[in-house]
């Protein structure tokens, strides 16, 4: 069995491959607990696309860990082990950890997208990272790149479990007022995904962003695209207009 450094190298080679998505089952053949360390490390990779693919692999791996059948569980497997990994994510976003937590919000969001039970348990704390202190739990992140990651994570969560974000529409509406353009754009993207849940209150605020030319890097459908706040606002409005009950 490969040592940790060798395993990280093997995982990175897979994620850097153009056919990486088709090769993800190769990672499924390995114990999930052994992949967590290498994947945490690869969230810091110099190559942006490798970092995003590490996010995808991280969520897939933790969800697999949570769903491992009792007969196949060893140390570090099962739902509680997956919870421990997500608590590690929360720790890495804590100032007391001494780190910055690059890529951690995205990895957390990808995991919640892939596992309903974990999403039910952790979605509120995820949203709390962009709630302003006066209406949150004191978790609000000041570092702009991390806030971008949280807004992306909320959008990813909304793709699978929009009902869990019904109470977060005010949080997202506040996100449309962020000073950072990428935060505004990612929030607009998320509100569009929520559809009817956000339609009544979000449409006017989104319309106000149609001329916003600030650039946004958005990872979706396995690819990184460069777009603008205005484009994402228009896309969101189109989705809201087509929402049932609208």
Show where each model-derived region lies.
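Alpha-helix N-cap/helix-start positions at coil->helix boundaries
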Residues: 17, 33, 48-52, 98-99, ...
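Alpha-helical solenoid repeats of the armadillo/HEAT superfamily
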Residues: 102-105, 142-151, 183-186, 226-234
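Amphipathic alpha-helical scaffolding segments comprising HEAT/armadillo-like alpha-solenoid repeats
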Residues: 2-8, 30-42, 67-90, 116-133, ...
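Long, ordered, amphipathic alpha-helical scaffolds
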Residues: 188-246
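Short coil/turn segments at helix-helix junctions and helix-capping linkers
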Residues: 41-49, 91, 95-99, 174-182
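Structural signature of alpha-helical solenoid repeat scaffolds
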Residues: 59, 63, 109-110, 151, ...
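N-terminal alpha-helical scaffold/docking segments in eukaryotic complex subunits
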Residues: 1-56, 60-74, 227-244
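Histidine/lysine/aspartate-rich catalytic loop segments that bind and position anionic ligands
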Residues: 125-161
């Amino acid at each position: 069995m490969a040592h940790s450094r060798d395993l990280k190298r093997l995982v990175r080679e897979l994620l850097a491959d153009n056919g990486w998505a088709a090769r993800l089952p190769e990672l499924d053949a390995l114990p999930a607990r052994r992949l967590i360390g290498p994947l945490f490390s690869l969230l810091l990779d110099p190559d942006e696309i490798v970092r995003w693919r590490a996010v995808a692999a991280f969520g897939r791996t933790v969800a697999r860990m949570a769903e491992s059948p009792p007969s196949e569980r060893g140390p570090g497997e099962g739902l509680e082990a997956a919870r421990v990994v997500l608590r590690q994510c929360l720790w890495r976003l804590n100032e007391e950890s001494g780190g910055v937590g690059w890529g951690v919000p995205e990895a957390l969001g990808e995991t919640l997208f892939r596992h309903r039970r974990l999403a039910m348990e952790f979605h509120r704390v995820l949203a709390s990272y962009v709630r302003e202190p006066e209406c949150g739990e004191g978790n609000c992140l000041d570092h702009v790149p991390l806030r971008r990651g949280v807004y992306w994570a909320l959008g990813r969560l909304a793709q699978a479990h929009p009902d869990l974000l019904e109470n977060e529409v005010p949080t997202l509406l506040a996100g449309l007022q962020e000073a950072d353009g990428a935060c505004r754009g990612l929030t607009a993207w998320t509100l569009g995904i929520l559809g009817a849940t956000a339609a009544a209150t979000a449409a006017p605020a989104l319309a106000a962003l149609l001329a916003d030319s600030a650039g946004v890097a958005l990872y979706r459908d396995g690819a990184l695209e460069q777009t603008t706040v205005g484009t994402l606002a228009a896309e969101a409005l189109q989705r809201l207009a087509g929402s049932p009950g609208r």
